[in-house]
Design a protein with these regions (language model features):
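PLP-dependent class I/II
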Residues: 1-226
């Protein structure tokens, strides 16, 4: 669904128009890549209410798949709600590669709450996929390491310092940017119409910039703050 560029929050009117009897799941990513937006408890409650109403209308579960690799990387006291508290039919996908600053290490978990419809079948499907897709099996050593680091995070204060420096610098130069509440990206609007040309020129200055068109939001570019 096209993002709301004004604040990168859910456009509930547009969402309801797109839900139909064929909808099996809705995917949310909060804290969000690339905008850094975080969905509040109020937002998740409203989304859950809509999905429950649609489940009753269509007579089948609509799963809310919550992609949460940046769960711990939030700023200024922002809280990330625990989605299963608001919608039973939830599946959570998590990765330690972000919380432990291990980019490229694809190790994490999929949570299927017991309250989810057909939870045993979902669990079996997740396990089966992990066995069948051998290239996604996490190395046994890193499984042991991750278990011992489960309650640890990288230094979030460093990310916040970088966010503030980049946000203040870009906005002082005239860029419009929604201040991220989480993750480690900024998603400012470029000062020209061609986001790809802007990204190419940025390479000359050793800047890591991704065109917004790759995220369905042209005329915006993603900046990495790490």
């Amino acid at each position: 669904m096209p993002p709301s560029i004004a604040d990168f929050q859910i456009d509930f009117g547009a969402l309801e128009q797109r839900l139909n009897e064929h909808t099996k799941a809705v995917v949310v990513n909060s804290p969000n890549n690339p905008s850094g937006a975080v969905y509040s408890e109020q937002t998740i409650k409203r989304l859950a209410d809509i999905l429950r109403d649609k489940e009753k209308e269509y007579g089948h579960p609509i799963y809310l798949i919550s992609d949460e690799p940046y769960r711990e990387i939030v700023y200024d006291g922002v809280q990330v709600p625990f989605v299963p508290h608001f919608h039973d039919d939830t599946i959570i996908c998590y990765s330690y590669s972000k919380s432990l600053s291990l980019p490229g290490e694809r190790i994490g978990y999929v949570l299927v709450p017991p309250a989810a419809a057909d939870s045993k079948a979902l669990y079996a499907a997740v396990c089966g996929a992990g066995r069948a897709l051998g290239y996604v099996c996490a190395p046994s050593m890193f499984q042991r390491v991750a278990a011992r680091c489960a309650d640890q995070t990288s230094d979030i204060a460093v990310y916040q310092t970088n966010r503030d420096l980049l946000f203040n610098g870009l906005t002082s130069m005239g860029y419009h940017c929604v201040k991220p509440d989480g993750a480690f990206y900024l998603f400012p609007q470029t000062l020209e119409a061609d986001d790809r040309a802007f990204s190419e020129r940025a390479k000359k200055y050793d800047l890591l910039v991704v065109p917004g068109a790759d995220f369905g939001a042209p005329v915006i570019c993603e900046f990495l703050t790490v």
